[in-house]
Amino acid sequence: WIMGHMVNEVYQIDEFVDLGANSIETDITFDDDAMAEYSYHGVPCDCKRWCHKWEYVNTFLDGLRRATTPGDSKYRKELSLVVFDLKTGDLSSSTAYKGGKLFGQKLLDRYWNGGNNGGRAYIILSIPDLDHYAFITGFKEALKNAGHEELLAKIGYDFSGNDDLGSTRTALNKAGIKDREHVWQSDGITNCIGRGLGRVRDAVRNRDSSNGYINKVYYWTIEKYVSVRDALDAEVDGIMTNEPDVIVNVLNEGNYRGRFRLATYDDNPWETFKR
C-alpha cells in the first residue's frame, strides 16, 4: 500500500491518487466536546509540506465517500484504504470513549451514508496514545448501537506512538481487539529526521511469528529512494509518503518488481500476507 500522507483537503485525494497512492492518511482534530471537527494537521509538520490545509470533517467525509463509491463521478477505484490519524491529544483517557462514539456515528452518517451504499474503502483508526484505547471501544459501540456492526469488517486499528510492542498489544486487548484482528502496526517519524528500522523489523517478526498480534506493518514518512528500498527490504506492507511516485518508481525496479505489487481492493488489508 502506498499511503499518501497528510491528505486534508478534498482536492488532494485526486492529487495523491494521480501520483500512485492507493491509500491516503487524513488528520482528524477534535473540539472541546470530543467531536471530530477538522481534517487538519497544523505545525509542525513534514518538511517541504504546507501544514495548514484543512476542511470541516463533514466536508472531507462527503468528498471521501464520493471518491470511494463506485458509480460516482468522483470515484477512484484505486483508493482502497484510508488511515484516519486521530489527533486525540486534546482528549483525556475518559473523553476518548466519547470521542470514539461520536466519530463512529459521524462516519456512519457521512461516509457510510447511514449504511446505505456509502463509501467502500477499508479504514484504519490510528491513535497516537495507548491510554486512549477507549476511543476504539466507543467507536465499536456506536456502530453496534446503530445496528451496523457489519461495518466493523471494514475497520482496522493502529497505535502510532512508536510504543513498546508488548504494551501496544495490551492496549489493543483492553479495547476488545484480539490478536491479529485487523491490526496494523506503524513505525516512523517525520521526514525531516532519519529513523532506523529496528522496531520495524521487530514488528515484521511479530507479524510473521505464530503467536504475534500484528497483521500488517507500515513505515512513515519517507520519500528518499534509499529509504524506500530499505523499507521494502525489511518486508513492510505499506509505506506512508509525501511522494507516492517515488514508491511507484522503486516498485518498478528490477529488485522489487517480482517481489511486490500494488494492493488492489481485492486484497484484504486485514489478512497477513504469506510469501
From Swiss-Prot:
Mg(2+) binds at E25, D27, D85. One of its GO terms (molecular function) is phosphoric diester hydrolase activity. Keywords: Cytolysis, Dermonecrotic toxin, Disulfide bond, Hemolysis, Lipid degradation, Lipid metabolism, Lyase, Magnesium, Metal-binding, Secreted, Toxin. Dermonecrotic toxins cleave the phosphodiester linkage between the phosphate and headgroup of certain phospholipids (sphingolipid and lysolipid substrates), forming an alcohol (often choline) and a cyclic phosphate. This toxin acts on sphingomyelin (SM). It may also act on ceramide phosphoethanolamine (CPE), lysophosphatidylcholine (LPC) and lysophosphatidylethanolamine (LPE), but not on lysophosphatidylserine (LPS), and lysophosphatidylglycerol (LPG). It acts by transphosphatidylation, releasing exclusively cyclic phosphate products as second products. This is Dermonecrotic toxin LhSicTox-alphaIV2. GO terms for cellular component: extracellular region. Its cofactor is Mg(2+). One of its GO terms (biological process) is killing of cells of another organism. The active site is at H5, H41 (nucleophile). It comes from Loxosceles hirsuta. Its EC number is 4.6.1.-. It is found in: Secreted. Disulfide bonds join C45-C51, C47-C192. Its main location: secreted. Belongs to the arthropod phospholipase D family. Class II subfamily. Binds 1 Mg(2+) ion per subunit. It catalyses: an N-(acyl)-sphingosylphosphocholine = an N-(acyl)-sphingosyl-1,3-cyclic phosphate + choline; an N-(acyl)-sphingosylphosphoethanolamine = an N-(acyl)-sphingosyl-1,3-cyclic phosphate + ethanolamine; a 1-acyl-sn-glycero-3-phosphocholine = a 1-acyl-sn-glycero-2,3-cyclic phosphate + choline; a 1-acyl-sn-glycero-3-phosphoethanolamine = a 1-acyl-sn-glycero-2,3-cyclic phosphate + ethanolamine. Expressed by the venom gland.
